[in-house]
Amino acid sequence: MGGAATMLAVASMVMAAKLRVRLRLLIPAVENSVSGNAFRPMDVVPTRKGITVEIGNTDAEGRLILCDALYEGASEKPAMMIDCATLTGAARVALGTDLPALFCNDDTLADDLIAAGRRVTDPMWRMPLFKGYRRLLDSKVADINNVSAGGFGGAITAALYLKEFVPDDVPWAHFDMMAWNNTSRPGRPEGGEAQAARAIFAAIEKKFG
């Protein structure tokens, strides 16, 4: 929900500023209740791209719907594609609660976002899409597993999972965030926070405004 709220905030700012940009907002939202047809560990499910996914952990459900949204969004070959998600606890372990982890397949887009974050005091930290860890998502019964073997590098492997659904020629940025303030600070009250929203808007405004 935190990632969806962040992207809604970005869309609201873009529309309020009347930027000359075609913006498409995709929010994958599904029921997540336990029922007789709920998915189970070791299930194999298809995706919009046609890739099959082994369910290694049912708690890694967010990436299962986000990957379909990314594949759909990439089908239009956008000038940039950005997603935000409260995807992993591993990103919090690595960077704490105040710094969203940025994963990006395009150095120019990453530099633009980081520079925008500095301008508007909306910090982030770039993390690697280390290709060597892709092997940790291998599955014996499907094209890919939804979690890594062993659990190490969880934020990286989650981002690598999503990368499978984004063509290399589509500039893409993925934010793995907390979207919450545990304590109040000046300008940042305790509670939900649209982390990276101001930075994303500032980058879009500079590029398309």
Question: What do the PLM-derived regions correspond to, one by one?
Answer:
Residues 1-209:
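A generic structural signal for tightly packed, nonpolar segments enriched in small/aliphatic residues
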